[in-house]
Amino acid sequence: MRGTLCCLTMACKSYPAQMMYGIPGNRKASAMTHRIQFAILALLCVATTLSAVSQSEKKTTPGGGPGGLAQATFVSHRLGTDHAEGVTTMDMNGDGFPDILSGAYWYENPGAKGGEWKRHQYREVSITGEFIADCGEWAIDVNHDGAPDVVTAAWQTNGVWWYENPKQAGVEWKKHQITDSYDTEGGVMADINGDGVPDLIFAHYNHSGLIWIDFAGAEPKVHHVGDKEMDGHGVGVADIDGDGLADILTPNGWLKQVDANKGNWEWHPDWKLEDAGFPIIGFDVNNDGKMDLIYGEGHSYGLYWLEQIGEGDTRHWVRRAIDESFSQVHALKLADVDGDGEPELLAGKRYRGHNGKDPGSYDPLVIYYYKIDRKTGAFSRYPVSVNGTAGAGTQFVVEDMDKDGDMDIVVAGKTGVHFLENLKVDRVPKEQREKEILIDKSWPFPGEGQEVKQEDPPGTPKK
């Protein structure tokens, strides 16, 4: 109402007399006419005020970007500088909030109001040079006892292992070997055989093909797929040909599933992706009904998508650049992080993937998310963390860690474990926020509010 009165006052000053009181000198203009004109102006002002309020609310809605587009902003929390690469989550203490597991430690979630993430050791992990024996972690109930266990694999350590959840605090988790394997750098969780139970697939099985592990039975069952020519740096799972079956994606082509449980696959050497990251993602980028690919150069510069064109014998692929500004794009993830109902692409730079020998090893660390225009196939980049301490190691975890309704991001790497808190919904108290911000001085700053003497511009004659 106060805004309406101000609007009417301004209108009285700005509208010409002809509009407010009739034509000058026309004394026959009735009082009723004046009242009607004034009422019309009042309605216009109210509508303008309500429109302005509506626009203001749209602009100030948390997570709202320019033009009303959904946009997410993140604050980075460095939980520790411990050697880490793989990362997963589970509720370790039963408080209803997911905790972060990475390497030998788990980090206790402080809850909805924020605070310190306390570190606890729950297992032992070996380190060779600067490589930790933990290039990937997945929470899976391996022994079907109702408690999630942790499955891991690594580049320089023999085997794929699972760590048994003792369901008791303060007890070290027992280590079990699933299979003998070297150079198992990364993997992907997906339901490969369509039984409704997530499986794991790994690249670099003794340089002689891939393995996928079925966890539906009493004991994990290991399946071997392909040979050395089909294997490589990177792996993914997607239905390439639209037959409803999960196919396997490698840097050298794809394995069409005929019957996964019986080991029947057809090889299609359709592409060469060099050292792709994990995972190679299958996604219909331009919404044309065909499965496209998204991949990053794990040890060089570049983030790309391959457009699938044609089908059957005429199927071919066209590479299109998404972003070539940063290197070591070793981990990717599709997830809705801005709350618009559509998945965004998460990508970031890994630190010292090859001991500092990769191109751009010491470029600034970055993590971005990309909105995908499904009509044109265009990608728009938004920052998550730029030139900070957070980089993308070998995995992204996207989950509502603080239970406030938006999706947060967790990463681990050689610069430590990071919780990237989504501020689209922020329920952390002001007092806690101020503890987290870098500024720790009292207000006002020394000298604040004092008059500052204006210096004369250069060349001014001295008095």
Tell what function each PLM region has.
Residues 39-51:
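Bacterial N-terminal signal peptides
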Residues 52-463:
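Beta-propeller-forming repeat regions
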Residues 29-40:
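Bacterial N-terminal signal peptides that target proteins for export
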Residues 6-7, 12, 45:
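Cysteine-centered motifs
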Residues 1, 10, 19-20:
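Methionine residue identity
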Residues 3, 22-25:
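Residue-identity detector for glycine
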Residues 11, 17, 29-31:
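Acidic, Ala/Val/Gly-enriched low-complexity intrinsically disordered segments
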